[in-house]
């Protein structure tokens, strides 16, 4: 039987998660039926979702025999909105823990982009026995850069878009999000804008969260040596959101890690270089 591509609608699921005395309705997509599970965690951009972030990576993983879970973190996509005054990544890690517990999944491989990478590190530090392998793209440490003034140009534009969610500000952010802007079609802009504006509560609560705690993503650098999982670090040479030296910091701190840098690539390696990225990840996951 020929492979049937996954669809967002057919794989859409919801679970209730208890967090800080409240019940949050959390959305995720559940794809494939493999013995090993790969969880994909998206970044923090306005309008981001698990499906939108990894649309070019889902089918190759499922075809290779993996079960794939795409989480909409609280405050994004179809999940409930929150005002968060603590560590955003620790919150995401707790939510993910509850989801995989309810799904009765003992161990997961984690693949995270930007905020998703930072949240993957948070999960691994808290529950190392639940993690197989780690793939960290354009995020994972927090902290300062040795070479780039912080906040970066990209983060400034991201925060501006949250405060003023217009098509003009979306294009300003996306223009430096990727290296080659020729793939940024009007249809992509329209879909992302619709995602943003359909959940204004997410936008407003992200701004409120920043006001409550400007440091949503703490510096995990001093604890990286605790990570024992085999780790693939992936960066874009031209990333203007999270500087490349953050990847070097991960490489230095995590003993069982390796770093792959894509040239002519911005903050979205899994999308900009999808074919090469997918093969890189599949080879990494298949290794003993």
Swiss-Prot record:
The EC class name is hydrolase
Stored Pfam families: Abhydrolase_1
> GO CC: one term?
cytoplasm
Keyword field: Aromatic hydrocarbons catabolism, Hydrolase
Q: In which pathway does it act?
A: Aromatic compound metabolism; 3-phenylpropanoate degradation
Q: Where is the active site?
A: 267
Q: Do the record's keywords include Hydrolase?
A: yes
Provide the site residues for: Catalytic role in ketonization of the dienol substrate (substrate destabilization).
192
State what changing residue 44 to A does. 2-fold decrease in catalytic efficiency and more than 5-fold increase in affinity for the natural substrate
Q: Which GO terms describe its biological process?
A: 3-(3-hydroxy)phenylpropionate catabolic process; 3-phenylpropionate catabolic process
Reactions that this protein is recorded to catalyse: (2Z,4E)-2-hydroxy-6-oxonona-2,4-dienedioate + H2O = (2Z)-2-hydroxypenta-2,4-dienoate + succinate + H(+); (2Z,4E,7E)-2-hydroxy-6-oxonona-2,4,7-trienedioate + H2O = (2Z)-2-hydroxypenta-2,4-dienoate + fumarate + H(+)
The listed outcome for residue 268 to G is: 10-fold and 20-fold decrease in catalytic activity and affinity, respectively
- What Gene Ontology molecular function terms does this protein carry? 2-hydroxy-6-oxonona-2,4,7-trienedioate hydrolase activity; 2-hydroxy-6-oxonona-2,4-dienedioate hydrolase activity; hydrolase activity; protein homodimerization activity
Q: Where is this site: Transition state stabilizer?
A: 114
Q: What is its EC number?
A: 3.7.1.14
Give, from the UniProt record, the effect of changing residue 114 to G: Weakly active. 3-fold decrease in affinity. Fast ketonisation and slow C-C cleavage
Q: What is the effect of changing residue 192 to K?
A: 40-fold and 5-fold decrease in catalytic activity and affinity, respectively
Protein function: Catalyzes the cleavage of the C5-C6 bond of 2-hydroxy-6-oxononadienedioate and 2-hydroxy-6-oxononatrienedioate, a dienol ring fission product of the bacterial meta-cleavage pathway for degradation of phenylpropionic acid. MhpC shows some selectivity for the carboxylate of the side chain.
Query: Subunit comment for this entry?
Result: Homodimer.
Quote the record's miscellaneous comment: MhpC is not a serine hydrolase (catalytic triad), as Ser-114 is a non-nucleophilic catalytic residue and Asp-239 is not involved in the catalytic mechanism.
* Family in the record: Belongs to the AB hydrolase superfamily. MhpC family.
Q: What is this protein called?
A: 2-hydroxy-6-oxononadienedioate/2-hydroxy-6-oxononatrienedioate hydrolase
Q: Which gene encodes it?
A: mhpC
């Amino acid at each position: 039987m020929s492979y049937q591509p996954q669809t967002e609608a057919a794989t859409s699921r919801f679970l209730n998660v208890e967090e800080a005395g409240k019940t949050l309705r959390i959305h995720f997509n559940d794809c494939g039926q493999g013995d090993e599970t790969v969880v994909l965690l998206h970044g923090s951009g306005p309008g981001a979702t698990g499906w939108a972030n990894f649309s070019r990576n889902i089918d190759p993983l499922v075809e290779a025999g993996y079960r794939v879970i795409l989480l909409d973190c609280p405050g994004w996509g179809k999940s409930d909105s929150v005002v968060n005054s603590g560590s955003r990544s620790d919150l995401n890690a707790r939510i993910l823990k509850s989801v995989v517990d309810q799904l009765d999944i003992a161990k997961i491989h984690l693949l995270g982009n930007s905020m998703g990478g930072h949240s993957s590190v948070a999960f691994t530090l808290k529950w190392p026995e639940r993690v197989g392998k780690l793939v960290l793209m354009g995020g994972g440490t927090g902290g300062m850069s040795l070479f780039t003034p912080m906040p970066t140009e990209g983060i400034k534009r991201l925060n501006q878009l949250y405060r003023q969610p217009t098509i003009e500000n979306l294009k300003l952010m996306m223009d430096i999000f990727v290296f080659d802007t020729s793939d940024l079609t009007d249809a992509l802009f329209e879909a992302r804008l619709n995602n943003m504006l359909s959940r204004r509560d997410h936008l407003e609560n992200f701004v409120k969260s920043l006001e409550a705690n400007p440091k949503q993503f703490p510096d995990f650098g001093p604890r990286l040596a605790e990570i024992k999982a085999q780790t693939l670090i992936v960066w874009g040479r031209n990333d203007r959101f999270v500087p490349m030296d953050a990847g070097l910091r991960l490489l230095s701190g995590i003993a069982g890690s390796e770093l792959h840098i894509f040239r002519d690539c911005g903050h979205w390696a899994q999308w900009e270089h999808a074919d090469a990225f997918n093969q890189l990840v599949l080879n990494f996951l298949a290794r003993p």
